[in-house]
Amino acid sequence: MASLEGTKAPDFELEGSDGTKHAIRNYSGKTVVIYFYPKDNTPGCTKEACSFRELHQDLQKMGVVLLGVSKDSLKSHDKFIRDFGLPFVLLSDPEAKMMQDYGAFGEKVMYGKKAMGTIRSTVVVGPDGTVVKHWQTVKKAAEHPEAVVDFLRNR
């Protein structure tokens, strides 16, 4: 999939770990970071989530909303949040509809085999609803949140 940079962010409506429905249209006027990850409570995803946790106050000071998205259930998200003290909302996309719209679900190679799955990626949506940054394939999960914050600081 081509980069989404410069395009209107695809809308979505998903249930969040906070018990409410979330849609990109509800964040008009705010900068939103949406990061897509494969699975709660797995090594790479936990490192990425904990790195975002450590930087969450920096994001809040900049007025940035952070949302994590995976196919996991809300029950799984609740456990993940509790286990690691995550201070941000996780969205459940069990059918991968939003992930497909954002290029975060498709064919990937794991351990030499092709399979369909979540592609670790991140988008930054500006206050006008336009995607201003799109990391299409995140390779270093633990370091990636710092790159996101650096991008936002230097914008």
Role assignments for model-derived ranges:
Residues 1-155:
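Chalcogenol-based redox active-site neighborhoods
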